[in-house]
């Protein structure tokens, strides 16, 4: 029997009750070592394993299996898959050309299997990845194989996949998905412009790396980025879309404060659109984003425990959660 969104939303709303609460986060912050954190997560039924990475992997697998069983149309998650495909293709490309193992670096779920990526790279047959990616992937291969410029090779792939993510999300029936990935690509451009300015990247690099997306003044930002960090931040501080001006203020505090602002901005969008929605795919997508954010929270807490960072500092770094 075909699944309905009415059923899916009811199921997701029940699942949301198991998402982290402030009490859960406080308990994790109080753990004295990573083993204690692992025990807490295992006892809560979050995932299985002897260490944090195993538990997170187990949890991710369970979330995706649940979404497969629950979502009427699993293809709605394609933009998220493409982000994993981007990571995987970079790993396979660099691993193949440097003759290093890469299998352990690959993440799921994804659109392209490890075997497909392997065949595409080893045989330089990027048509296996589809018409929309073929030319850019071949260009990235050419750059890395003949110049060793991993940064430029990555930039070519980033641009191609960001454009594909935009196109795919805009074709969906979800206004939220379109808006969420516009914001994702927007801030990917912001990060690229800042990194480019700090690394003294030339205009040619930035023209390749930064893509067109609504509300992002591409030409103006590229022109500023070539001049350096201060001119770049000045131009970005005058952009109000997606709270960019506020993000720049956070960057001036610290890069980590900026990253937190961006993550929280995306989470606020999900909470505003998905938690209030009573139909369509948005509530299911919101649950996925919530689960991914929880993984970031666990990583931050585990890192704080390992480095013996004080409670207030770790808490300040935590992302806003969905629950």
Which stretches of residues belong to each language-model region?
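N-terminal domain-start signal
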Residues: 1-323
């Amino acid at each position: 029997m075909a699944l309905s969104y009415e059923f899916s939303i009811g199921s997701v709303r029940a699942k949301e009750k198991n998402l982290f609460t402030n009490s859960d986060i406080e308990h994790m912050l109080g753990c004295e070592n990573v083993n204690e954190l692992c025990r807490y997560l295992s006892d809560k039924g979050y995932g299985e394993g002897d260490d944090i990475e195993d538990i997170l992997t187990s949890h991710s697998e369970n979330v995706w299996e649940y979404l497969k069983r629950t979502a009427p149309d699993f293809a709605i998650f394609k933009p998220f898959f493409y982000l994993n495909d981007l990571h995987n293709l970079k790993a396979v490309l660099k691993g193949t050309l440097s003759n290093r193992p890469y299998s352990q670096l690959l993440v799921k779920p994804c659109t392209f299997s490890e075997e497909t990526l392997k065949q595409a790279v080893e045989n330089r047959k990027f048509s296996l990845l589809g018409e929309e990616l073929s030319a850019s992937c071949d260009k990235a291969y050419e750059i890395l194989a003949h110049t060793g410029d991993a940064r430029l090779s990555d930039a070519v792939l980033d641009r191609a996949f960001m454009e594909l993510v935009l196109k795919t999300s805009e074709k969906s029936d979800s206004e939220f998905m379109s808006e969420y990935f516009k914001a994702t690509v927007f801030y990917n451009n912001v990060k690229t412009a800042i990194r480019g300015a700090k690394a003294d990247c030339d205009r040619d690099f930035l023209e390749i790396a930064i893509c067109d997306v609504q509300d992002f003044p591409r030409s103006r930002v590229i022109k500023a980025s070539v001049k350096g960090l201060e001119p770049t931040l000045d131009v970005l501080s005058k952009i109000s879309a997606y709270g960019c001006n506020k993000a720049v203020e956070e960057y001036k505090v610290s890069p980590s404060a900026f990253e937190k602002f961006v993550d929280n901005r995306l989470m606020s969008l999900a909470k505003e659109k998905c938690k209030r929605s009573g139909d369509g795919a948005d509530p299911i997508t919101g649950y996925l984003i919530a689960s991914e954010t929880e993984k970031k929270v666990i990583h931050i807490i585990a890192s704080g425990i390992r480095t013996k960072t004080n409670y207030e500092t770790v808490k300040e770094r935590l992302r806003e959660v969905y629950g």
